[in-house]
Amino acid sequence: MAEQQKGLTYADAGVDIDAGNALVERIKPAAKRTARPGTVSGLGGFGALFDLKAAGYQDPVLVAATDGVGTKLRIAIDTGEVDTIGIDLVAMCVNDLVCQGAEPLFFLDYFATGKLEVAQAARIIEGIAEGCAASGCALIGGETAEMPGMYHKGDFDLAGFAVGAMERGADLPQGVAEGDLLLGLGSNGVHSNGYSFVRKVVELSGLGWDAPAPFGGDSLGRALLAPTRLYVKQALAAVRAGGVHALAHITGGGLTENLPRVLPKGLGARIDLSAWELPPVFRWLAETASMAEPELLKTFNCGIGMIVVVAADRADEIAALLAAEGETVTRIGEVIAGEGVSYDGRLL
């Protein structure tokens, strides 16, 4: 009798279930380190459980946010520097939650690739866990998708989903009024927006990712991969102190587009651009691309990653509290009658 022909396996089609299982086991300790009050289940179930009552909430309202890190991923992939891209993913979600007045509670990630490389994926997800731990947010689940034929070799994509809560009636923005002051919290560089433009500028410059950064510091690739700052704990401390009327996360759209999102109809903002120094990375991008200042202001954070809108009589107290939490705090402007954002002074 002829030997029976071996049948096709899932691995033959390019999906390695054993690699997926190995990844889950490898990242379990990192996920476990993010556990917080309310965490009920660990990784591996069909769904993840979270107990709002155990987290201390009486009459909670849930807030959800989802995001990615855009084409910053391309730099991480091309340089092999993937250890902090997970921090970016978490920051893009939890910083948005805080702007609603919510405390981040738990996080789920989606990691997709053509061929799962366990060591690479573990580095990425350990970065996600680091961001979660720094935000008091539990990493309670996720999805790893190995999809042959969908991605070029070595490529991957990331998405994150975060849920937070606040007690009913504590949502932001709330009480924003003419005369409120704007406190700017320093950014850590470009953060996670505008990277299609950044990559185009690097292409125009003729520099490689391993070249020294023209604006100082490490290699160009590493400098541009500086992770997005997490503002959660310090922003929540300010909110709980009272006097904070709104928070604006400065992401895609820059100062020009993001601040109006938290201002009620009939109110605008005046920002003094001479109040802070434009970080060198933005000056280099603008000069290399001959970028006009208005375009810069509606593309990048320009050194201000979060704006805190505060009652004028509480501004000094809130600024001191934020500084004590390690923030670089700058009074950058005020709320005025009108619409949109107007600027005094120059950055460039």
From Swiss-Prot:
Location within or outside the cell: Cytoplasm
Keywords: ATP-binding, Cytoplasm, Ligase, Nucleotide-binding, Purine biosynthesis
Pathway: Purine metabolism; IMP biosynthesis via de novo pathway; 5-amino-1-(5-phospho-D-ribosyl)imidazole from N(2)-formyl-N(1)-(5-phospho-D-ribosyl)glycinamide: step 2/2
Signal peptide, first to last residue: none
CC terms in the record's Gene Ontology section: cytosol
Name of the protein in its database record: Phosphoribosylformylglycinamidine cyclo-ligase
Domain of life: Bacteria
Species this chain originates from: Cereibacter sphaeroides (strain ATCC 17023 / DSM 158 / JCM 6121 / CCUG 31486 / LMG 2827 / NBRC 12203 / NCIMB 8253 / ATH 2.4.1.)
Keyword Nucleotide-binding annotated: yes
Catalytically driven reaction(s): 2-formamido-N(1)-(5-O-phospho-beta-D-ribosyl)acetamidine + ATP = 5-amino-1-(5-phospho-beta-D-ribosyl)imidazole + ADP + phosphate + H(+)
GO MF term set: ATP binding; phosphoribosylamine-glycine ligase activity; phosphoribosylformylglycinamidine cyclo-ligase activity
Annotated HAMAP family: AIRS
Main location class: cytoplasm
Pfam families hit by this protein: AIRS (PF00586), AIRS_C (PF02769)
EC number(s) reported in the record: 6.3.3.1
Biological processes per GO annotation: 'de novo' IMP biosynthetic process; adenine biosynthetic process
Family: Belongs to the AIR synthase family.
